[in-house]
Structures are given as C-alpha cells and as structure tokens.
Amino acid sequence: DGDIGFWFTGKMPVRSAKVDRRLPTPGTGEYDWKGDIPFDQMPQVVNPKQGFLVNWNNKPAPWFDNGDDSEWGPFWPITDIANEIKDIAPLTTSKVAHVGLHAGTRHMVASALLPLILGAAERTDADNDPKLHAALQYLRAWNLYQWQGDVASGILDTWMGLAGVNALADDFGPMMPAVSLDGDGTRGGGPKIGMIAALSVTVRALQGPQASLPLKYDYLKGKSRDEIIIGALKQAIGVLEATKGKEMSKWGRQPSWIKFDPLPPIPATARGTYIQIVEAAKPDLNGMDILPPGQSEDPQSPHYGDQRELAGYWLFKPMLYKREDLVK
C-alpha cells in the first residue's frame, strides 16, 4: 500500500534516577533496573513527513537515551545520507546504490571538520604562511571523497588528532584517547568508542556556541578556537614533513584493503562485505546484492572469488526471487 515505518525493539531497561550512565553502576541493589521500557514508549514512526527513513547505526530518535553506546555526534554519516536521499527523485534501486557508494567513500567526518579549518583560515592571516596556504588549497579543492593519493584527507586525519589533544589534553592528560578513526578516514577496522566520544567533544568545543549541542564546560580554558585550529594545522604539516617528506603532493592517503587471500584484495571503504538493496515493488520484489567472499567464505569454494571484483567497484548482482529465473 506504499506505507513505510519502523519500530525500535528489544528489552531496554528503566534505570534508577540515581545512576550516572557514564560511570560504573554500584551493585548494591538500590541502583538496579526498574523493569523494561514499555513498547509504546520506544521509538517508532509510520509514514514520516519527509517520506523516507534512513539509518547508519545512529540513534533511533534524537530524544531516545540509550546509555550503553556513544558512537554518535555532529559528524555521523546519517546527516549526509538524509540530505542526499531527499534530493533524489524518482528514488530507484540504482540511485540508492550510489548513496551507499557515496557514504562509503566520503570522509566520515570531513563535513563537520573542514568548515572549522577553512573558517579559521578566513578569520586569520593563515594564508600568509606559504606552507599553511598550500595545505589550505588542498583542503579547499577537496570534494570530501577519498581516493588513493588523496592529500587532503591525509592532512585532515593528522590535524584531527592534534586538534583533539590541543583542545582537551588540559583536562584529560594521559587519559586522552587518540582522536582519530582508523587511519584512513573510514571505519574499516572500527575505532574505539573513546575515540569517537573524544572526537565529538573536540568538534563541539571548536564549534563553540554554534555547535548543535554547545558544551557547558570550557575545555579550551579561554584559548582562542582559531588559534587551536590553525596551530594544529601547523603541527600537522610538521608531522607530515617528518614522516612523508617536504613534498606535500606526496602526502597522499594510502588505501587499506579487504583481504581475500589467496586472491588479491579490494580497497577497504566504510561498508560491509554483504550489501543488499531491495525494492518492495508490485507484482514482484526488485533487488540486488553483493557478497564477495560467497556465503561459505571458503577459499576452497569454486565461487569464493566470483563477486570479488564486482565488490571492488561497488557493483551488484541481481537478486533472483523465482525458481524459473535461476535457469535463465
């Protein structure tokens, strides 16, 4: 009938009001759970006003407080995905596939971080420094997508860790986790939750009052946000010069890989090895999927590598729903 909806399920605890979910809960009884959240109080929606639903491991609703996870923040990919979906008409499976490609190859946090750097450069005399100017030119020309040899993402990833330390180290010192993803701007290996939380706080601290959720605590201790941002960029240039040489064009991103030993690997991006795109059409379902290691993931299988090259190019194979289609 064309209806869409979702219901968030599971047994979610009603916690004691005394519990601070950021800290371990004492096991002395008075902090025990008070039952489960009723189903009608869980996030759910049917036929939302925007006409679509999207998800990328994000919170099920802004108001829902699931205290067991913190991998959210102003940079989570769901915002870019929603903005892209709303501008697609008509919405087809092939166009949805491109949304996945864009989400998987776009730098995960650049859309939140890049405006901080470029804004600080506009407000300061950073461009008077030849090295800063050259780095800023790479960042200004960047389309936020990652590719082998991409200099801008290498600069941003290095800046990210240094900016986090400069912004938060006064409070966290040796407890400060590395503010990074997994070295290439994707989540291929999965960052620690502490890294994500630190990055979220760093972004909000550097955004200041303009943050969607401004911080109440002054982690910067009155220091200039622009000074921290440009200072971290200077440091990043120094680190990259020391590790990759003076020639900035050689600071490009090196890809990581999804291995298919003994076959050659494919480039690793923010994706699963199994992806399906299904349209609930009438009279038949319409869909495509990709599963590069095969269902068995057995290197001895004759079909182990059938989909490897397709996956490397973000391509899909048709999903067959009828037995007669199998013999065509």
Language-model segment annotations:
Residues D1-K328:
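C-terminal/peripheral segments of proteins
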